[in-house]
Amino acid sequence: MISKVKIGAQVFRVVERLREDDGMLSEGSLGYTLDDENLIVIQKNLSKSKKQVTLWHEILHAARMAWESNVRPKKTDEYEVWEHYFIGLYESVLLLVLRDNPELVDWLREED
């Protein structure tokens, strides 16, 4: 497991914790992101492949927090408008995450 990940201009610490030691890792929660602390927490006793998916999930949360603008489509806008909103939200930040974190890419490519 990696110990940090750069997301845009922010560096997030990545830690593993046991469910019984962390009340935020409630039933059904495998990880969480605290934006104000630049912290990503992953449940420690998961399989490697589940940790990989969970870390990527939390990176997406952090990316949204870092890059989301206040301009959102209206609820009544067409699907294509919303689709482009989400693609635009992630296109640059995900490219930066992959470029800035070669150790993350290597770790994500490892198999169980």
Region locations from a protein language model:
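Active-site recognition of the HExxH zinc-binding catalytic motif
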Residues: 53-65
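Metalloprotease/metallohydrolase-associated module, dominated by Zn2+-dependent proteases
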Residues: 1-50, 66-112
